[in-house]
């Protein structure tokens, strides 16, 4: 009985293969090509582009460290600046990092709209760098007079990577100060208190004491 059932199963399988052999072969070929294509793309396009973008950005980083911000952004006529690196290699890790550099350069040279554009397009899984980018966005929005957006990004920076005590405490302090300046006194007081609670041994906590005292709140 069991042998007969096995024969039926084998016969059905053979019949299925005979009827759908072409379709199955096509599907398997597509899968193989997709896997092979991704491997080729990763190893023959992405990897070389990453290496090229790092090389291309070297001089721009050097100008950035020297505070030659226009050359860092736009190059020197021979070497690329961050803007060109982003244009040519924006999809690489180095191209992504160039957005952070460019955003800071634009911010420091007073081009706040372009600073926002580059910083919003920057994204990384590195919490330290992402928190710094959020803080720079807060600075840019503050310069543009968009206080609500600035406060949002300052708080986002403080909460994204609180282990970076200086940056997190300072970001939250900026949010508190801007809230106070915007007439949001209650929110400002809560933020000053939060700074003292979360970051007690920082300069931001000392500054918070001063501003709370101005509101007749003493601890």
Which role fits each region the language model picked out?
Residues 1-32, 40:
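N-terminal positive-inside, membrane-proximal cytosolic segments immediately preceding the first
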Residues 47, 86-95, 109, 123-131, ...:
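Short solvent-exposed coil/turn linkers within tandem alpha-helical repeat scaffolds
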């Amino acid at each position: 009985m069991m042998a007969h059932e096995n024969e039926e199963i084998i016969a059905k399988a053979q019949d299925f293969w005979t009827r759908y052999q072409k379709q199955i072969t096509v599907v398997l070929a597509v899968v193989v090509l997709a896997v092979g294509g991704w491997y080729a793309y990763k190893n023959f396009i992405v990897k070389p582009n990453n290496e090229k973008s790092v090389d291309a950005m070297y001089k721009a980083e050097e100008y950035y460290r020297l505070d030659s911000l226009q050359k860092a952004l736009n190059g020197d006529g021979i070497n690329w600046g961050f803007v060109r690196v982003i244009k040519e290699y924006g999809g690489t890790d180095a191209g992504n990092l160039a957005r952070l550099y460019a955003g800071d350069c634009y911010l420091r040279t007073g081009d706040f709209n372009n600073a926002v554009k580059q910083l919003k397009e920057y994204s990384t899984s590195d919490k330290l760098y992402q928190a710094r980018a959020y803080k720079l966005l807060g600075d840019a929005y503050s310069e543009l007079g968009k206080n609500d957006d600035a406060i949002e990004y300052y708080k986002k920076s403080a909460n994204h990577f609180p282990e970076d005590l200086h940056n997190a405490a300072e970001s939250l302090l900026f949010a508190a100060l801007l809230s106070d300046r915007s007439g949001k006194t209650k929110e400002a007081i809560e933020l000053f208190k939060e700074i003292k609670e979360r970051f007690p041994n920082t300069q931001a906590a000392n500054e918070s004491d001063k501003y709370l005292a101005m509101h007749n709140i003493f601890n």
